[in-house]
Amino acid sequence: MSRALLELNGVTRRFVAGEKDFIALNDINLTINAGELVAITGASGSGKSTLMNVLGCLDHPNSGSYKVDGRETGTLTDDELAELRRDHFGFIFQRYHLLPHLAAIQNVEMPAIYAGTGKGMRVERAQKLLERLGLSGHLEHRPSQLSGGQQQRVSIARALMNGGEIILADEPTGALDSVSGKEVMNILLELNSAGHTVILVTHDEKVAAHAERIIEMRDGEIIADRVNTDRPIINEKTTERLPTKPRQGNRLMANIGLFQEAFVMAWVALISHRMRTLLTMLGIIIGITSVVSIVAIGEGAKRYVLKDIQAIGSNTIEVFPGSDFGDTKSMDIQTLALSDVAALSSEYYIDSATPNIGRNLLVRYRNIDVSATVSGVSPSYFQVRGTKMGLGVGFNKDDARRQAQVVVIDHNTRIRLFGPKVDPLGQVILVGNLPCTVIGVTENKKNIFDTSKNLNIWMPYETASGRLLGQTYLDGITVRVKDGQPSKVVEDNVNKLLQKRHGTKDFFTYNLDSVMQTVQKTSQSLALLLSLIAVISLAVGGIGVMNIMLVSVTERTREIGIRMAVGARQSDIRQQFLVEAVMVCLIGGVIGISLSFVIGYVFSLLVKEWQMVFSLGSIVTAFICSTLIGIVFGFVPARNAAQLDPIEALARD
């Protein structure tokens, strides 16, 4: 005797219609044995479709007990019910319920994907099923390219993909012509003779006549359950048997297959609505482009500014007489001396030091007179300042010892006195009343901190002090901090040393490193402000993604129902839509980053002084942001999709 496969005891299913309850099933008691061919008949509204949904674990009874192969379904979770549908049931719908964007073989493969069957095995089985059902030449055809009978055979193949121990056929011939309907019925009869339990839900008496057992329903109750003694004789099959149930893969294989399916589905959904997808991505594209470009511009600007600061001596400390800039008493303080320079130079934290004295003097070359700042400095001055020579050389210690009448001029002085075509090296100019030979010209560097047209001339300190100005005290001292030494600590040490030597604090220091720190902080603050604006743009883009995904869930409700019917769990559906949201955002991110590089290239053509600097960190951050936006803003639509009721989803047009 066959075992009891499906058992219903006291099953009731009611629906709320407004303020009234509608009883679709009323105290149903039914047992269906393995291998039976059962027809459930009744007029429209009799409850036969609701009974099929309960039998197929697509719907839950309000009361009573339903067991599948001895397993009580009332205690199962939604995911466990999905596994039950996947492993035991195969659905054949009146309207086929094939996914229109997938080929026939891909529609058939779907249940095996959720079962974790390897790709090679499921493709082979799907192909054999379709060939067995006479569709060998239509494997890659989409539903729109198939006739009604062919689509129903694809639906049958899908129902058999995971074995189809129990076949639930809802009006399987209702949408077919007589020839196609007869072919489908012959297939179902063959399946039953091969050991499958087949349950036909129909109002067509001719279809029900093929069953060995007929159950009649009216107003949610079983009014008759009889053995069909008038069943027509079934001819012995002449065709080959259907391929056996495939061996299911492990969960890892299932996850890999699901991810592949999710990405394929996401891509198909995106390219099916190109304009909508582009508009959805627009906010993400603008946001990512803004973030990456702002960071690149900020980094480029910061490097440009810091480079200019370093050019004028970023690791230098200036010492001046008085208490601060603008001190009226500083002119009377004459305590800074050459011995202070020597004392500072001997300290381990000082790379080099130079004295400074200077005046504005009249400078003459032939019949050209100009006013220039003349400074007396040590030979190490140019090293301290990081100044390079464009022409010639700087003066050396021997020049200083001899009080040589040699000078180094800047580019502005060269242009004013000699013009761009005359070689100034070796030319004699009159500095005040002192004739001096030009031995070097400093490099012409464009600097945002020195845009003036001032003329500068440098000569050995000893020459300026002994031959030109007659001044023994210093106007200032410049020290260069040794590499690796903290500038702030060195500044404190310089203050302590000079205060100890002078016995009082009659000087002040100016550390250009503080300017660098200020520039860096300002740059970071500005970049943060602009990035926040860009983040707002990203958030707006994310909301757009969420809106369009909610629309997508609504449009694809029936697809979700089909996937649930063939065994998709809630987590599978949730993953499907999350992947789609992430893909939208990632593609938008890639386009945004690409646009940033285009902007950087155009920027380099328009602005020669400095360039946008793209960092790997900002690009990686952009990708991470894109992914997070997809996850965060795609979660609600994905959750909504996963929580859909299979019956309601299948009923949507």
UniProtKB/Swiss-Prot annotation:
Gene3D superfamilies documented for this protein: P-loop containing nucleotide triphosphate hydrolases
Any one GO molecular function term: ATP binding
EC number: 7.6.2.-
Membrane-spanning ranges: 252-272, 278-298, 526-546, 583-603, 616-636
Coiled coil residues, start to end: none
Broad enzyme group: translocase
Entry-linked SMART domains: AAA
Its membrane topology: Multi-pass membrane protein
PROSITE patterns in the record: ABC_TRANSPORTER_1 (PS00211), ABC_TRANSPORTER_2 (PS50893), MACB (PS51267)
Keyword RNA-binding part of the UniProt annotation: no
Subunit structure: Probably part of a tripartite efflux system, which is composed of an inner membrane transporter, a periplasmic membrane fusion protein, and an outer membrane component.
Family, similarity comment: Belongs to the ABC transporter superfamily. Macrolide exporter (TC 3.A.1.122) family.
Protein name: Probable syringafactin export ATP-binding/permease protein SyfD
Record organism: Pseudomonas syringae pv. syringae (strain B728a)
